[in-house]
Amino acid sequence: MKQFLAICRSQAARWMAGRLAATVICLCGTRSMAASALDDLRPLVVTKTWTEHTAEKQGDTQTREVTAEIWTAAFQRRIDEAKRLEIPARPEPYYVDGPIVLPSGATIVADPAAEIRLVPGANTCIVRNANLVGFASGPVPSDSQPDTDIAIDGGIWSTTLATTPAAPQGNVRGGSGQKPPVPGVHGVILLQNVRRISVKNVTIRQSRPFGVHLANAHEFRVENITLDRHRRDGVHVNGPASDGLIRGVRGDSHDDNVALNAWDWKHYTPSYGPIERVVVEDVTGSPEGLPSANSIRLLPGVKKFDDGTLLDCPIRDITLRRITDIKEFKCYGQPNLELGRDNDSSVGVGRLENIRFEQMTFHRSGTIEVHADTDGLVIDGVALDFELPPAWHLLAIGPKSMTYKHSPTDTAKWTEIFSPDLDCTVRNVRVSGVRLAGSTEDLPTERLVNVIEQRLNPDYPRTTPSGGTGRGIWVR
């Protein structure tokens, strides 16, 4: 425990140092010695002036005029000519006003301290692969012509959410930056329709889009990702996807640290399909007291396209291991609240197959919540270093109910967040090695598993939630 607290203090100190550094806006009129590797590209660098908002301290917003260099064309020239871009560190950010586009075989290597920052109002991703292809109207075909062998290593990537969640400075979507745009893409680093790609040693800072957004991705590695005051998912994978490794995600994210979404809300995914054979390991929640979602999501479902075609989007053969202080494991569906649950929902609950949770550590309460038809769920090796509340369970099986109040007083605008009327069946569950800190005895399964049966709330909307008629079915 002492070692963990020391690590937390060290992490918090590093993040605080990064935050203080991020509040300093440097005018870019002088050339840095560190940028000499890019000197031949300087004729392509342009200087512009704009307004940015920064936060000197929480809630204290400052408006500053910034004159800085725009490096988009210069970076793109290096990629187009050499397929390798090296970005050295320098005191000021490298601003871009649109995506850096990577063809097959391209590599970006950035110093860990080099910040690549999106100008306010660009509203695009910062870097993407070349052949983005959206599949909003049907399943991904076999001949999608993916980009291959792309690598991104290092750098601080920021879309300048400089103050609060309500102040994204015009950068909210993380779009493709092309015409016509590809629907559903939403990333700071965006790799969709790709094979054999790698993203590692990067920091995602103060951004509204997903940190790393992958879709229709196979044979991928995402490693050593730091989330710094991030406002969306850290690593977000949409189906179809397979044969991936996500390792070493840490920091403070205000949405899921990692999300594997085979089905998803239509305006946040460019494609749908199974996610299989993925390892997620060494994911650490934020230190105690630092606001963060601290969650991992597995979202299966059944997609109904506009022509009525159905596509099963299961999640299978997934291993999550060495996970620390993640408080919510969200293995359930969730209708689209932004576009309306009647306009975008999975057709029934999704399917999970062969899901493994191994070597998990909780210094505070956390739960695995499952509302999906599941065959094969293993939980093995869990350390519980907190006092267990009487009603706490490690695994909850069954539907959830929660009310979202679009208006605090107009109950006609209230809506159910989840799908409390749907049953789910879970079989082949094995729970072992779950122990309190310092104990050599496993906790009994009955203490760890809760099977949920919803009831309609006769007092709704005077009290919430509305409840439902669905239940979890555990086949033992």
Question: Could you say what each language-model-derived stretch is?
Answer:
Residues R9, L27-G29, I126:
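Secreted/luminal cysteine- and crosslink-motif detector
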Residues A6-C8, T30, T464:
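Intrinsically disordered, low-complexity segments
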Residues Q11, G29-R31, R427:
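General secretory precursor processing signal
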Residues G18-R31:
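Bacterial N-terminal signal peptides
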Residues I25, A34-R476:
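Extracellular/periplasmic carbohydrate-active domains that bind, remodel
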